[in-house]
Regions:
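Bacterial N-terminal signal peptides that target proteins for export
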Residues: 1-9
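Intrinsically disordered, low-complexity serine/threonine-rich segments
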Residues: 9-11, 48
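Hydrophobic h-region of N-terminal signal peptides that target proteins for export
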Residues: 12-19
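A beta-strand edge to alpha-helix "cap/lid" segment located at domain peripheries
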Residues: 19-55, 62-162
Length: 162
């Protein structure tokens, strides 16, 4: 093998090795996703901007609210958010914990503890604690968006009546 030919093979091999996807940086993506989720919780907690709140879900997202029909797609989710914001005394906030990622870093899920408040029949605030599981996808634009969102009640403490 001539030196020129060997050099060409080395150059092609090095160039091909550099063409693969960038390695997945778990720590960096964890920070980005937790920050994005915290921003979403703050926007939702303000209870004012339906479009901004809905923007954190993907166009093909599905939400499964406790005791209610499944909500599919951005338009239906936007309507769900608008309806929630219209409930007297409505307020929601959550905090998610450490995400778990797919091996390629394109999907993740997180658990969360949430608190929702609504006005009771006499106007007194009712606090409704909950828990949630969200599934996130990193879209082509590099932004994390929620693709599945489900929440329910935590278990009742031992000895308490519901």
């Amino acid at each position: 093998m001539t030196p020129v030919r060997f050099g060409s093979i080395v150059m092609v091999t090095l160039a091909a090795a550099g063409c693969g996807p960038a390695p997945f940086d778990r720590a960096a993506e964890q920070r980005k996703l937790l920050q994005r989720d915290a921003e979403w919780a703050d926007v939702a907690s303000a209870g004012k901007d339906v479009d901004k709140t809905a923007s954190y879900w993907a166009d093909d997202a599905v939400i499964i609210p406790q005791g209610q029909p499944i909500v599919e797609g951005k338009a239906a989710i936007r309507a769900f958010v608008a309806g929630s914001f219209a409930i007297p005394g409505f307020h929601v906030h959550w905090k998610s914990d450490a995400p778990e990622f797919s091996p390629d870093g394109k999907l993740a899920y997180m658990r969360a503890a949430n608190d929702m408040t609504v006005s009771g029949p006499d106007g007194t605030p009712l606090n409704l604690p909950g828990r949630a599981l969200t599934v996130w996808r990193k879209d082509a634009d590099g932004q994390w968006r929620c693709v599945a969102d489900i929440w329910n009640d935590p278990p009742q403490p031992a000895g308490s009546a519901k």
